Amino acid sequence: MGKYNASMEHFGLALAGSVAARTVAAGLLLALAAGCADQQPSEQADTATAAAAPPPVPASSPDDTVTPVDNIDQATAAAGDLSLRQDAPLHYTVKKGDTLWGISNHFLRDAWQWPQLWYDNGQIKNPHLIYPGEVLTLVMVNGHPRVLLSEDRLHPRVHEMPLDQAIPAIPIDAIREFLRGPRVVDKDEIQHAPYVVEFTDEHVIAGQNSGVYVKDLPKNSAASWSVVKIGQPYIDPDSHETLGFEAIPTGEADLREYDKEVAEMMLTRSPQEVEIGNRLLPLEPESFKADFYPHPPAKPVEGRILSVYNGLSQITQYNIVAISRGSRDGLDPGTVLGIYQTARKVSDPYDDGKVALPEQKAGVLMVFKVTPRISYGLVMTETRPAHVLDKVRAPRSSSR
């Protein structure tokens, strides 16, 4: 890696070695056992290719000078706009159950600045993955505080490790139920989707192990389908554009007998009652990739909260929200946005008219699933009550 201070040896970093050694050491950071593999069909589906690329983590250079941090005051004095915590650890051992967001919060007041803090040599595939047992060390690189992977980790990374063993960016338990929940579809997708016309037992509703008749099922199509109820439209409160429709899963169905007019299917899963008129959509993959990390939006963006998963009225930490911006607006998994209460106007007690109150920051969310027009985010921090129609945009740095 270049010119390393001899005193680095007591950190066990061994960073001055060969390119191979640097490659092993650099395969780190912010993984996320959670990056959205359950993408939407048709226009809604192209999330991976449509999403803007996240800000690149600055790669190392052979000419970098890396020196140890003797005390945290030395690092914070050189942090500049980086919100390095006064109580940041000089070393941190990654534990099972950690998240990248949580680790970033150990070092930074603004966890979304992680790409500025992380030191990556960019020479291996998936350089932003961190695994339990690895040791992160705070150092100075060319006079600026950075965090890198120490050779003093508990379990040296000899071979490339599987994605699903890396720590996630966000707590997976907070979104697990949602991953089999609603999705966003457009009007054209709805109109061309097969639909339930009757039940084999002639009941008005059906559940698991019930037979259903389905019209317009494509020939040679998949054997298993998701059954959904079309819910509310998502409408941009500012432009009034219809962004899509909520498709709420009511069950899953397997093909029993195909007919070009009406196919017979069996409900293999039914979290809700299936009704005549419910539409069928292709099943979404259940895996949730771990390949994104917290970062600010790639370009200026402002939107609004459209809804809260499970219909809650007040938004708190680890609630899931739908927002009115998507991949076409530059959002991708890992994008961090600030939540700002909609400015209120109150009556002036001594003068006719209204007084506009200042906008207040209510929290921070991280996007974990995107469609072209709508994204879903997990509320990571909450400082004030937030509600539907509150604004979201790039977060303000606490160092300012």
Can you annotate each of these PLM segments?
Residues M1-V19:
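N-terminal secretory signal peptides that target proteins for export/translocation
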Residues G2, A37-R400:
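Surface-exposed, polar/charged interaction patches used for macromolecular assembly or partner binding
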Residues A6, A21, A45-T47:
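A detector of low-complexity, intrinsically disordered, Ser/Thr/Gly/Pro/Ala-rich segments
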Residues A20, V24-L28:
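Sec-dependent signal peptide hydrophobic core
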Residues L32-G35:
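C-terminal motif of bacterial Sec signal peptides marking the signal peptidase cleavage site
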